[in-house]
């Protein structure tokens, strides 16, 4: 393997970045840098009680570390790294209905669940990665029904092969046979007294 720059792992929250990257880094004998952990140590709370990340400061911090050869994981990857920082970017994708169940089971607020499901449905993270790093560096992996170890192995094989992305990008909207199913996926449960 000739890669000397970083390998990026990104995706919408809940797609398996942490699990996959923690399995992949040792397979590749590379250091793992988790953007969320680094961001949490630098973040401040905004007026709404959410953590606000200074992506420019995070980018400087990550580049000040041993970025070369590392596996860098996080949904902010395209906001923090430059195209010249990476040789390969794995975008983890997940069927929005599966993602909704995953995030709900983790205790995410319903509003956050819907925000992330919508982002996955329309491919926000994939689009950002392709725009930032270029389509030849970006590879897409469906984690909906695949174990993290299998995803890590597939990424390892693709990385070692050196082949560019060849499959067309996934469009989750094609998997929903009606606008009713799409609306139901993106709607909040009714909480008014009439619904109980």
What are these regions (language model features)?
Residues 12:
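P-loop (Walker A) phosphate-binding loop of NTP-binding proteins
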Residues 9:
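Hydrophobic anchor at the beta1->P-loop junction of P-loop NTPases
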Residues 130-196:
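NTP-dependent small-molecule kinase module
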Residues 15:
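ATP-binding Walker
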Residues 18:
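Walker A/P-loop
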């Amino acid at each position: 393997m000739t890669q000397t720059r970083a390998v990026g792992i990104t995706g919408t929250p809940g797609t398996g970045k942490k699990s996959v990257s923690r399995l992949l880094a040792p397979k590749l004998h590379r250091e793992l840098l988790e953007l969320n952990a680094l961001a949490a140590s630098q973040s401040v709370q905004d007026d709404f009680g959410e953590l606000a990340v200074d992506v420019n400061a995070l980018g400087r911090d990550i580049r000040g570390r041993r970025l070369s050869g590392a596996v860098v994981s996080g949904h902010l990857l395209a906001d923090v790294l430059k195209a010249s920082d990476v040789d390969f970017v794995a975008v983890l994708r997940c069927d929005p209905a599966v993602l909704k169940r995953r995030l709900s089971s983790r205790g995410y607020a319903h509003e956050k669940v819907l925000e992330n499901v919508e982002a996955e449905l329309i491919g926000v993270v994939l689009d950002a990665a392709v725009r930032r790093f270029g389509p030849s560096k970006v590879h897409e992996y469906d984690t909906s029904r695949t174990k993290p170890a299998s995803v890590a192995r597939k990424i390892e094989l693709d990385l070692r092969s050196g082949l560019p992305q060849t499959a067309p990008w996934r469009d989750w909207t094609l998997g929903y046979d009606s606008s009713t199913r799409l609306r139901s996926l993106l709607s909040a449960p009714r909480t008014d007294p009439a619904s109980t």
